[in-house]
């Protein structure tokens, strides 16, 4: 298991990577970050919250379709309930709330989960 510092560094990099990917898509999403979380607000007013949970060594995603807890397993962040990787989960929940297909997150988190 990696050190606390490297875990926090990888989470910082993950949050920045999510923001960077959102900047690349042509969807009007307001992104606010701080206090260990990202809040994505859509035109409809709905939100997705991506938050770090260092005590559990997890990333949590809260969306209209539910709450998802992801843990690192080998080279990926995996959802405990759906089995989805972080990139697949983010593509799905952002697509659902944006009302159009989004594939911006493919591969995100895999390189940072090692």
Model-derived regions, located:
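N-terminal intrinsically disordered, cationic/polar leader segments
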Residues: 1-114
């Amino acid at each position: 298991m990696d050190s606390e510092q490297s875990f926090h560094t990888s989470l910082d990099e993950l949050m920045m990577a999510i923001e960077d990917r959102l900047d690349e898509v042509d969807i009007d999403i307001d992104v606010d970050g701080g206090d260990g979380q990202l809040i994505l607000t859509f035109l409809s007013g709905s939100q997705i919250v991506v938050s770090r949970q260092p005590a559990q060594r997890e990333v949590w995603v809260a969306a209209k379709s539910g709450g998802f807890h992801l843990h690192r397993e080998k080279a990926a962040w995996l959802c405990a309930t759906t089995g989805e990787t972080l990139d697949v989960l983010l593509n799905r929940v952002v697509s659902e709330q944006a009302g159009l297909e989004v594939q911006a997150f493919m591969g995100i988190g895999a390189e940072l989960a090692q």
